[in-house]
């Protein structure tokens, strides 16, 4: 929608192999490419993907003519200096082996030392690639716990400052193991990092900074660490070896070694289970082609019809850039049914022209939001979808009425962990059951099973605060930020255009941006979070689509705060 004032010469699609993901993520990636090609036909498009053997496939799948103006090249994988080990978790034995049998021989040789132990004793760092489920249920930590004695408590002031910054952001307790205690923070005090897609982006950036500064000893990560982030380790332990995801394996191997900028031969080590040795050898020799057919051009009966409508809109050029919705969706939200619901909803949401607070959100308000979504969707929700949407609407309305991320996490935890009840009745606090909590799941999905994130069959004291934090982020980022905010923004804005009811415009901005303050909206568009806006806004003199001008008082900010805004100075 900003194409009129954008003069773009180059567009780089990094990690472009995402276009091959067999999920909605792959569909969205391809849709961005197609939309960009249409809007910026004179720009040069660059697709970068590691190890891909047929990079020209991106040109074919996006209908880019193969002529003298197009070019593709495969850069062969080069080994940057690594040694390889197998590990037998049952016996604890480590063995050396060669990735090329012709050069190194067919037999593995027992190692006279434990490479993980040696690395940690020498001040090195270890990346363990594991499943998200194993990180969340802590099984992976238990398996490597014998090494944690080699990870002493962090004492560096800069490291402690980063840990406190993270603690404050997620709202975790300090010196209180009964309530709001974060296992992630406790681990971080020993240089043990968790990294996965449900960790909030702000928290992830803190963790990456913590690692880049050399404070990380152990990092337990999922595929979120495969792509792009400059976080090298001395050892990469591939606990989750998936031969079907050979590209992921190659990306991970590239993280072993070069962990410092010192002019030394810092060889990296790669460790796999003994059973994965043959698969690893095959993986390193395997070609990595991507499909020459876009997800947009494939009919998939398994996905919800909403996604098929989205694909059709991209192909037919009927996607509305103003709302990030299809034109068919926009027509749905202009319906008389929605026009009848909105006035009642606005009367409930605003009292004396002020938006209600979080405690005043009623069941009736949430039901109208349900009805609006079902009208947009064009069908009733199944029970499991409705449960997920109910939780999402509650979180969205908390955000709209001024709750920060940590506030929302604490509210959800307080309910599911029965905090008030346990504090009120300390004599039976240990036996009080948890409350049922619905977790994030992608909707629409008519086949979604109906099961909780946290069941009411466990004890309240056993509720894990980190689980609530991660699930809250999934709702805010993957559902509210990525989908619901666009839908409800369009509904309220269209009603405002039709009725001129200022409350509807305010509600549209609350849903989309979490504020109606023009300066704050622009600051959000510039990429600042609400936590950053809180301390930075007084120093903003003016802001619009052209530039952001700061007052001289920015010189009084902390160095860490100045670093955040230095890119805006020229």
Explain the meaning of each model-derived region:
Residues 40-43, 246-289:
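Conserved segment of the helicase C-terminal RecA-like domain
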Residues 275-334:
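Long, hydrophobic alpha-helical segments
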Residues 34, 42-151:
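Conserved interdomain linker/interface between the two RecA-like ATPase lobes of SF2 helicase motors
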Residues 243, 311-570:
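C-terminal accessory/interaction regions of large nucleic acid-associated machines
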Residues 1-4, 77, 113-218, 233, ...:
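Conserved C-terminal RecA-like helicase domain
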Residues 8-10, 218-241, 268-271:
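A short beta-strand element within the Helicase C-terminal
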Residues 2-39:
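SF2 helicase catalytic motif II
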Residues 16-23, 193, 226, 242:
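Catalytic acidic motif of RecA-like/P-loop NTPases
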């Amino acid at each position: 929608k900003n194409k009129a004032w954008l003069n773009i010469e180059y567009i780089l699609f990094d990690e472009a192999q995402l276009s091959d993901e067999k999920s909605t993520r792959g569909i969205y990636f391809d849709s961005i490419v197609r939309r960009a090609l249409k809007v910026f036909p004179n720009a040069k498009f660059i697709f970068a993907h590691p190890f891909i053997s047929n990079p020209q496939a991106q040109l074919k799948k996006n209908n880019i003519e193969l002529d003298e103006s197009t070019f593709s090249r495969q850069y062969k994988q080069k080994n940057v200096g690594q040694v390889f080990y197998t590990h037998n978790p049952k016996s604890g034995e480590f063995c050396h082996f060669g990735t090329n049998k012709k050069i190194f021989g067919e037999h593995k040789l027992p190692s006279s030392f434990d490479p993980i132990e040696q690395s940690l004793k020498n001040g090195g760092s270890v990346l363990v690639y594991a499943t998200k489920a194993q990180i969340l249920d802590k099984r992976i930590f238990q398996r490597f716990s014998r090494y944690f004695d080699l990870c002493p408590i962090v004492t560096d002031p800069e490291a402690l400052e980063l840990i406190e910054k993270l603690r404050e952001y997620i709202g975790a307790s300090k010196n209180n193991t009964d309530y709001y205690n974060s296992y992630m923070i406790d681990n971080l005090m020993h240089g043990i990092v968790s990294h996965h897609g449900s960790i909030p982006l702000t928290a992830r950036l803190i963790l990456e900074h913590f690692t880049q500064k050399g404070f990380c000893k152990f990092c337990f990560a999922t595929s979120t660490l495969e792509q792009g982030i400059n976080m090298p380790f001395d050892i990469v332990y591939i606990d989750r070896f998936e031969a079907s995801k050979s590209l992921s394996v190659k990306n991970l191997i590239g993280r072993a070694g070069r962990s410092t900028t010192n002019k030394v031969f810092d060889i990296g080590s790669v460790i796999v289970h003994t059973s994965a040795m043959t698969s690893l050898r095959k993986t390193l020799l395997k070609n990595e082609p991507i499909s020459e057919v876009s997800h947009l051009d494939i009919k998939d009966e398994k996905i919800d019809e909403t996604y098929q409508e989205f694909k059709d809109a991209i192909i037919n050029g009927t996607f509305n850039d103003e709302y990030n919705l299809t034109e068919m969706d926009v027509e749905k939200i202009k319906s008389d049914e929605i026009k009848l619901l909105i006035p009642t909803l606005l009367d409930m949401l605003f009292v004396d022209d002020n938006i209600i607070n979080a405690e005043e959100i009623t069941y009736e308000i949430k039901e109208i939001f349900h009805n609006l979504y079902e009208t947009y969707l064009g069908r009733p929700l199944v029970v499991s979808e409705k449960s997920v949407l109910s939780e999402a609407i509650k979180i969205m309305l908390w955000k709209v009425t001024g709750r920060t991320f940590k506030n929302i996490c604490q509210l959800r935890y307080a309910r599911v962990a029965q905090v008030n009840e346990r504090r009120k009745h300390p004599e039976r606090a240990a036996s009080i059951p948890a409350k049922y909590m619905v977790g994030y799941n992608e909707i629409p999905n008519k086949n979604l099973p109906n099961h909780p994130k946290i069941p009411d069959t466990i004890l309240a004291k056993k509720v894990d605060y980190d689980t609530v934090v991660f699930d809250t982020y999934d709702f805010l980022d993957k559902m509210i930020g990525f989908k619901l905010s666009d839908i409800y923004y369009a509904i309220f804005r269209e009603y405002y255009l039709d009725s001129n009811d200022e409350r509807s415009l305010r509600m549209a901005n609350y849903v989309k941006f979490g504020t109606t303050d023009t300066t704050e909206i622009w600051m959000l568009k510039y990429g600042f979070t609400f936590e950053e806006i809180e301390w930075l806004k007084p120093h903003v003199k003016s802001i619009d689509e052209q530039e952001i001008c700061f007052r001289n008082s920015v010189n009084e900010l902390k160095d860490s705060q100045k670093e955040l805004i230095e890119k805006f100075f020229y």
